[in-house]
């Protein structure tokens, strides 16, 4: 971030899994983001706006060999490459409403907004488009045969205003995509929190709603590594944005669904499957701290892995360890490696030069009994 220019710019850094050899590999005026390893770990894929629109690029792990992979007619806002590496799932906006200039072509310079229905605005964004998920063939150098999963439907997936690629997921065999969608419009859309998880079959071009009976938010699907289950976050009631965020799984063969996080009396936030599909790791808030937990699917028991006056955000599996961001009242976000016994290793030291000049205050917890004990 540049204070004189009042402008930020994202760059890409890489490091070894133990935190060593942390280095910046891009130094450009563009916005590199959503970086993932591809092609067996030999390349990095990322989004950037080099040529004015956000497109998919690749580069070597040292930052060399920067190459544009897509030239889509629109911004790519998120993406996921299929497990077999042959398909690209990406998000892009489609026009869903006529502008004033569309309605009155004799007034091409008109900037006024004509509002006749909800939802006409999300925070600071006028609603004129909707994000749609697209699937394309991907040969490693470009895309072809692009298909809009929602076709001409006026809905959004992922959901505005905060949803991203985490609301969509490939299955293990690369022939199905699970996506989050609230298939409502107008006033009904504006007052409802009833989204569902849909599964789109690439082979037969059909979509199935797997959460129709639940009336609250169903979001963020993830397939298990063995391909036998799908997990997602679920709220029970329509219209309650702050309802309990529960974790559900479904057996893809039998269709049996199970509320697996009953033992945790708080929201399930970020989650990731264990490599053996027998455990799910997740972050959740308890007593003012966001810790990492392990959910044993054999008996749905929950065990805290981390402790302390910290907040963990996001969680990824790396071998026999978890990788997560952590911050506290005394420290901004840094990346940590977390062993399953709860021991942690700080991998980044992005703000050390600042903290070394400061004497931080002591932070303590205080708990008081309420009238009901």
Regions found by a protein language model. Name each.
Residues 369-373:
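Phosphate-binding active sites in nucleotide-utilizing proteins
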Residues 11-13, 55-57, 132-134, 196-198, ...:
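A short loop-to-beta-strand structural motif that recurs across blades of beta-propeller domains
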Residues 2-19:
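Beta-propeller domains
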Residues 93-152, 180-196, 245, 315, ...:
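Predominantly five- to eight-bladed beta-propeller fold
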Residues 16-20, 60-64, 138-141, 201-205, ...:
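Short loop/turn segments that connect beta-strands within beta-propeller blades
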């Amino acid at each position: 971030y540049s204070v004189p220019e009042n402008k930020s710019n994202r760059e890409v850094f890489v490091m070894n899994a133990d935190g060593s050899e942390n280095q910046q590999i891009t130094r450009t005026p563009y916005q590199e983001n959503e970086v993932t390893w591809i092609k067996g770990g030999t390349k990095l894929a990322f989004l950037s706006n080099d040529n004015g629109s956000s497109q998919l690029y690749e580069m070597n792990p040292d930052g060399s060999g920067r190459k544009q992979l897509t030239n889509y007619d629109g911004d790519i806002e998120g993406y996921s490459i299929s497990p077999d590496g042959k398909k690209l799932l990406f998000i892009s906006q489609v026009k869903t409403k006529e502008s004033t200039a569309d309605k009155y072509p004799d007034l091409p310079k008109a900037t006024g907004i004509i509002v006749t229905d909800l939802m006409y605005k999300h925070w600071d964004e006028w609603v004129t488009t909707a994000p749609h998920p697209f699937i394309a063939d991907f040969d490693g150098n470009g895309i072809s045969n692009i298909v809009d999963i929602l076709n001409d439907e006026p809905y959004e997936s992922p959901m505005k205003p905060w949803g991203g690629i985490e609301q969509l997921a490939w299955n293990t065999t690369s022939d199905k995509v699970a996506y989050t969608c609230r298939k409502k419009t107008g006033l009904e859309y504006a007052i409802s929190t009833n989204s569902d998880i849909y599964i789109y079959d690439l082979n037969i071009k059909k979509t199935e709603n797997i959460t129709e009976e639940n009336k609250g938010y169903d979001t963020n699907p993830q397939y298990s590594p063995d391909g036998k289950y799908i997990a997602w976050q679920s709220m029970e009631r329509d219209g309650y944005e702050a309802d309990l965020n529960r974790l559900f799984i479904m057996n893809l063969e039998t269709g049996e669904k199970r509320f697996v996080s009953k033992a945790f009396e708080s929201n399930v936030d970020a989650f990731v499957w264990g490599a053996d599909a027998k455990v799910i790791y997740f972050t959740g808030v308890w007593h003012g701290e966001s810790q990492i937990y392990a959910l044993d699917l054999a008996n749905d028991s929950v065990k805290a892995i981390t402790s302390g006056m910290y907040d963990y955000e996001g969680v990824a599996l790396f071998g026999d360890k978890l990788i997560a961001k952590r911050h506290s009242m005394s420290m901004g976000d840094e990346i940590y490696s977390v062993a399953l016994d709860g021991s942690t290793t700080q991998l980044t030291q992005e703000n050390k030069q600042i903290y070394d000049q400061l004497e931080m205050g002591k932070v303590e917890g205080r708990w008081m009994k309420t009238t009901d004990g």
